[in-house]
Amino acid sequence: MTRHRELFHDLDAMTRLFGRWNGSLLQLSRGQLAAEAGVAQGTKLRCFQVQANQHVRTLGGADGTTCTLIPVTGPLGECYWQQRRVAAGEVILRGCDIPYDASIEPDAKVTALLVSEHRLREAHRSLMGREIAHSLSGWHSLRAAPIRVPRLLARAGEFLAASASTAVGAAVCEDACLRELVACIADGPAEIWPLASRAALVKTALEFLHSTLNRPVSSLEICQAVRANDRTLRLAFQERFDVGPVAYQRILRMHAVRKALKSRKTRSVREAAMIFGFTRLGSFAAEYRIHFGEQPSETLGSRPSGG
């Protein structure tokens, strides 16, 4: 078993904690990031626990094998999961065939347990004496018994705290987590989440915004691209991200500049800013500092020597 917990002030550094995870984190709110993240890796499952002081969007690809289960507490009920809100006391189940998409409010603590679909089905068969009654594809909201979420969180906490030096104790904690996951699935029923029209509109708009990161876009241009009126589009983005589509694209562009500044592909703040359509460098630098809590020149200076 391996276990690690660390404090972070940079989302890219926190992403690396998750190892081979094919995903990205996007800070939507303004200010210096302060986050704590922990991970425990056993022989049967992985457990992540993350809490940050900023509004963060989490995106991850489907790997075709791993399911993710997340118990929902009060604060997490205010967050968006696959463009839906979920009630406290439910358990989110993401199938291995669908990308991860969550918009997490500031200070909400996320505890996620990841296990292969094969292992989950095998454990359910062993513990319950029957196959899982429903599909594990897509996103589901599991309406488990009221005791399930606190018990699952308690077992996950024990697994995260288990010492790597006591292999037997860690294995017991891991099996206890797996047993609680099976109990949540067995409680059922599972509600499959279809993509509502407003969520589908956001998805289409995001595809357009990601394709235009080299320049700013106007509300008119976005409305024409997605064939929706301005009010509907703004409401959909405000509901999901707390900002409108134009502001959201600007955040995307700032993150793109930040990524460029950390890489060896740009030599100056000016060059990176211009690539992504920021032509007023003074205004850009001020906005960048407000959003990330540091000057763009500090980001540039923090990359490894030789960049």
Language-model regions, residue ranges each:
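Generic protein-terminus/edge-of-domain signal
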Residues: 1-76
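C-terminal flanking helix
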Residues: 241, 249-253, 258, 289-292
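Short hydrophobic/aromatic patch on the recognition helix
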Residues: 233, 237, 283-284, 288
